[in-house]
């Protein structure tokens, strides 16, 4: 059953999911909304993608967790993944966001991130809470993501849609926060959204 305030944006690589998230973060911060969670920006060297970092949206703390240069760890595509590095940033960032923020952002929930069972557990905790959340996920079917999608508003993004979708999400989230704040609750706990 769909829960109010949970959003998942799905799309192919390069479709603009992360760009949409960055635009949304700018809008939320400018409006005074406290937002936390994680981003997983790609790392490029001379135009070639070499890996991914994980970044705590609230504190800015980050670390590389997937790289073509790593020699150990599970493989996803051409990258080796350090689950330990990922968890050292992602788990406290998401727990902190759940406790301290009005909106949680998770960019993204994909194969590399789901190598961490602890990550999946905290994502489920966020999903079961009432906090407004926005996440991104790949277009391919992944069982764990399908379960989350069943209780979310799913938005399919195509190249060129980032601005339009970020505006839509900002307006939806602003409306939800307005209702929550007017009912004198400290924050809308329990809603997860994926972009």
From Swiss-Prot:
It is an enzyme of class 3 (hydrolase). SUPFAM superfamilies: P-loop containing nucleoside triphosphate hydrolases. The keyword Nucleotide-binding applies. CDD domains: RecA-like_Thep1. Its EC number is 3.6.1.15. It holds the Pfam family NTPase_1. ATP binds at residues 11-18, 103-110. It comes from the Archaea. Keywords: ATP-binding, Hydrolase, Nucleotide-binding. It catalyses: a ribonucleoside 5'-triphosphate + H2O = a ribonucleoside 5'-diphosphate + phosphate + H(+). InterPro entries: AAA+_ATPase (IPR003593), Nuc-triphosphatase_THEP1 (IPR004948), P-loop_NTPase (IPR027417). GO terms for molecular function: ATP binding; ATP hydrolysis activity. The keyword ATP-binding applies. Belongs to the THEP1 NTPase family. Has nucleotide phosphatase activity towards ATP, GTP, CTP, TTP and UTP. May hydrolyze nucleoside diphosphates with lower efficiency. PANTHER family: CANCER-RELATED NUCLEOSIDE-TRIPHOSPHATASE (PTHR43146:SF1). This is Nucleoside-triphosphatase THEP1. It comes from Korarchaeum cryptofilum (strain OPF8).
